Amino acid sequence: MWIGIISLFPEMFKAITEYGVTGRAVRQNLLEIQYWNPRDFTFDKHKTVDDRPYGGGPGMLMMVQPLRDAIHCAKSVAGDGVKVIYLSPQGRKLDQNGVQELARNQKMIFVCGRYEGIDERLIETEIDEEWSIGDYVLTGGELPAMTLIDAVARFVPCVLGKQASAQEDSFAEGLLDCPHYTRPEQLNGLTVPPVLMSGNHEEIRKWRLKQSLQRTWLRRPELLESLALTDEQSKLLSQIKQENS
């Protein structure tokens, strides 16, 4: 997977490229990330990248010319088939379905806004999609871009040690994850559920599914409204509701 980053602060992405699963993916050439800083496309000695908005009001906007030129340069390197994404509070809210949808793209450019945002005409002419990571405001698009990179990279073949992990994580099937346990067997008087030490893989699977359903029902019941539950899931959910009534 190839990802281009348009950012005034490309150094922030060391958190993605040098550490953890994504850092390993970069070192193994499974994930390639390139950067374009709009400051490098300015012509004045101050490398100005902000400008006043028409109509007045507080704050500044990113200057059109440096940002547009940076996007064009990134597009020319990426070639055909690249999708340009602007990280914006006005965008489609990211969820696991959105992550899997984005992961099907082999080439993406993430445009990270700053100040009060970017000129609407750039959105209309240069941006393919807008995405948001939640209903709150951040100081820039870098953290949302890193969130998207981390999430989609998990679906790149061979990035995870066990590819099934991406399919078994929270939200992979629209449900919250089940509880997990490791050694020691007892911790502060609490013990590991016996079923997990039984060696019965089918019973363990059923226990995990029930726990996942229960967590979702108790903590995020709205997630269940959009799911087409299997017969097994429906029966387990009925049991859960009876046990908690």
Swiss-Prot record:
Q: What is its EC number?
A: 2.1.1.228
Give the binding site residues for S-adenosyl-L-methionine.
Answer: 113, 133-138
Q: Which InterPro entries match?
A: Alpha/beta_knot_MTases, tRNA_m1G_MeTrfase_C_sf, tRNA_m1G_MeTrfase_TrmD, tRNA_m1G_MTases_N, tRNA_MeTrfase_TRMD/TRM10
Cellular localisation: Cytoplasm
Write the record's keywords in alphabetical order, separated by commas.
Cytoplasm, Methyltransferase, S-adenosyl-L-methionine, Transferase, tRNA processing
Molecular function per GO: tRNA (guanine(37)-N1)-methyltransferase activity
Q: Name one GO biological process term.
A: tRNA N1-guanine methylation
GO cellular component assignments: cytosol
Which CDD domains does this chain map to? Answer: TrmD-like
Predominant subcellular localization, coarse grouping: cytoplasm
Query: Per its UniProt entry, what is the enzyme's top EC class, as one word?
Result: transferase
Q: Pfam families, alphabetically?
A: tRNA_m1G_MT (PF01746)
Give the reactions, separated by semicolons, that this protein catalyses.
guanosine(37) in tRNA + S-adenosyl-L-methionine = N(1)-methylguanosine(37) in tRNA + S-adenosyl-L-homocysteine + H(+)
Family listed = Belongs to the RNA methyltransferase TrmD family.
Function noted in UniProt: Specifically methylates guanosine-37 in various tRNAs.
Q: How does the annotation summarize its subunit structure? A: Homodimer.
Extract the PANTHER family matched here. Answer: TRNA (GUANINE-N(1)-)-METHYLTRANSFERASE
Q: Please identify the protein, giving its name as recorded.
A: tRNA (guanine-N(1)-)-methyltransferase
What is the protein's species of origin? Answer: Histophilus somni (strain 2336)
Q: Which taxonomic lineage does the organism of this UniProt entry have?
A: Bacteria, Pseudomonadati, Pseudomonadota, Gammaproteobacteria, Pasteurellales
**Gene from which the chain derives:** trmD
